[in-house]
Amino acid sequence: MGQQRIAVIGAGMAGLACARQLAGADARVTVFEQSRGLGGRLATRRVDGLAYDPGAQYLTVRNSAFVRYMGIAMRAGAAAPWRPAVLEDNRSWDAPFDDWYVGTPGMSGIVRPLARGIDLRTGIAVHELVRGPAGWELETDAGR
């Protein structure tokens, strides 16, 4: 039958984790992302030379699989522990949380290790899935 072709729509954490698992099972995976970059809710945007994270400001890590992945991301320089300073009533102290992490240099850094080696198509919005003569097809601005 040959290698199975699979499209994943969205290059956020879930889409890229799914693509990574499918690629590891010998599927031919293509990820389609409508924006120019990766991350979904972990996206880092740039405007006039300034970068900002419009979604999540940090992640918490509480399950063993995610702990392992964050270790990979930190070794790759894509994530770092975050201990924010808390200011309340004119007093400041470090937050007592050990499981807060940020992406480096921005939050989208966290997903970059997942995207390595994956066929990723950015700037392509998928509008519809259509059953064609050869199977399912994706409808985009450029056609099928």
Question: Where are the language model's segments positioned?
Answer:
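Beta1/beta-strand and adjacent pyrophosphate-binding region of the FAD-binding site
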Residues: 2-14
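Core beta-strand elements of the Rossmann-like FAD/NAD(P) dinucleotide-binding domain
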Residues: 2-4, 139-144
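Glycine-rich FAD pyrophosphate-binding loop
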Residues: 7-9, 21-47
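A short, Lys/Arg-enriched amphipathic alpha-helix followed by its capping loop at the start of a domain
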Residues: 17-28, 114-118
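N-terminal FAD cofactor-binding segment of flavoenzymes
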Residues: 44-85
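Short beta-strand to alpha-helix junction loop
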Residues: 58-62, 87, 91-113
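A conserved short coil-to-beta-strand element within the FAD-binding core of flavoproteins
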Residues: 122-137
